[in-house]
Amino acid sequence: MNLLDYLCQKESVSSVITSDRIKIGGTTDAWNMMLMACDFYQGNASVFVVLPNLYLAQNYYDELIAFMPEEDVLFFPSDELVSAEMIAATGDFLFERIQTLYTLLEGRKKMVVTNLHGAIKYELPLSCWQNNIFKLKQNDSVSIAELLKRLVRLGYEAVYTITKTGEFAHRGSI
């Protein structure tokens, strides 16, 4: 039995998780993460963890995937201020957000870690996401023009040469 399983079985932890109103102070981040993980595994719904800034959100995500299966934890980043060093990472953030939204549409419960800006940032309506999801299989026949339009609608960027995550290139005949 690991530490997480042990804590989730403790009556004191269960009473904290099931309480409608409770105020907890003076705890460590590690304890808070354990409580969130217990809440996630004992509950029937996704858990959203909103932290004040991107740095803390990234740290929580990294710590959570250290003791929870990585497929149960999603990262939904949003950069508040884009510095010169962060411009290259912005595409990675966009792809991470798209992947998180796509995974949430599958309907299985997940723990989603984000920062405040990520939680309040405007997103496309649910119907728009659902209408634009598609899967390609080997030997499928698709319209290239329609495929390119759909990729752009989903947030991918059309470029001549791919240099970062979230870009795609269309090559003509040779």
Where are the regions that the model predicts?
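ASCE RecA-like P-loop NTPase motor cores
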Residues: 1-174
